[in-house]
Swiss-Prot record:
Its main location: membrane. The keyword Transmembrane helix applies. It comes from the Eukaryota. Changing residue 228 to K: In strain: cv. Bla-10, cv. Bl-0, cv. Can-0, cv. Cvi-0, cv. Ka-0, cv. Kas-1, cv. Lip-0, cv. No-0, cv. Pa-1, cv. Per-1, cv. Sei-0 and cv. Sorbo. The chain crosses the membrane at residues 179-199. PANTHER family: OS07G0553800 PROTEIN, PROTEIN, PUTATIVE-RELATED. It comes from Arabidopsis thaliana. It is found in: Membrane. GO terms for cellular component: membrane. InterPro entries: At5g23160-like (IPR040411). The keyword Transmembrane applies. This is Uncharacterized protein At5g23160.
Length: 271
């Protein structure tokens, strides 16, 4: 009876050992153990393997949760996040300080230019940063320590006056171009008014000279001619008049001729 019992034990132990080896568990075979049924031993091995199989990953998970590396990583992340916050606050402070400085300098320049020309400053409405020539270099590069680069600060706002002069020239040209047609129309209207007024004056003067001055001048010329004839006459007539005073076409001469005719007739009748 001893030999078959040993064979049965060896078969059961070998099968259980192979089954357990599939799950990575080894077991030594002891020949002195009591005989156990195959079904009961398989159930025991399954229970053992289940407990061992599920016990190991739980331990591994608990170890992973308690490892110091994850805590160190979380602390590092917190520190980097805080450092980023501090750097951002520094950058914002420096940028705002630089903006305040730029606006203060712009105000001083504007105060000087307002005393020179107030009208130009009223018309100009520039943007705060683009007018001063602060391009992307104005937002200077910030180092890891939070300091500003002096090169970008020096060369950022060096040409505000030139830009201001150019803008004022452009404004003046636009105004002149808008006023050109108005000025031309006003000049044309003035010339027409002057021509009309002078034309009326010229017409009045011409008519007055033709109707009033010319006859007066003619009468004066005839009087002068009569005086000259009297002075140049050689003798007097019968009635004490100069021969040069006779005017055949005059009314006095005609009356004289008629009277003389009547006298001659009366003299003949009386004879």
């Amino acid at each position: 009876m001893g030999k078959p019992e040993r064979k049965v034990r060896e078969r059961i132990n070998s099968s259980s050992s192979y089954f357990l080896r599939c799950f990575g568990v080894s077991r030594k075979i002891h020949s002195d153990k009591p005989i156990v049924d195959a079904g009961q031993e398989i159930q025991k091995t399954k229970k053992k393997t289940r407990t061992r199989w599920f016990s190991r990953p739980t331990k591994f998970r608990s170890k992973e949760e308690i490892t110091p590396t994850s805590i160190y990583k979380s602390e590092k992340q917190k520190l980097t996040f805080e450092d980023d916050k501090q750097n951002l606050f520094r950058v914002i402070r420096h940028v705002t300080d630089r903006k305040n400085v730029a606006t203060s300098g712009y105000k001083t320049v504007d105060h000087e230019t307002k005393e020179k020309d107030t009208n130009e400053q009223r018309d100009i409405n520039p943007e705060p940063l683009s007018f001063l020539g602060y391009d992307d270099k104005f937002y200077e590069r910030v180092s890891t320590d939070g300091k500003l680069d002096p090169t970008n600060i020096v060369g950022s706002g060096s040409k505000p006056k030139e830009i201001r002069e150019k803008s004022s020239r452009v404004r003046k040209r636009s105004r002149v171009s808008k006023l050109d047609p108005v000025i031309g129309i006003s000049i044309i209207m003035l010339t027409l008014m002057i021509m009309l007024t002078w034309g009326r004056l010229c017409a009045i003067l011409c008519t007055s000279t033709w109707c009033y001055i010319f006859p007066r001048l003619k009468e004066a010329a005839t009087a002068v001619a009569v005086v000259n004839r009297k002075r140049s006459g050689s003798g007097k007539g019968e009635e004490g008049s100069f021969q040069g005073d006779l005017d055949l076409n005059s009314v006095a001469y005609k009356k004289k001729v008629v009277l003389e005719g009547f006298l001659v007739r009366q003299h003949r009748v009386s004879m």
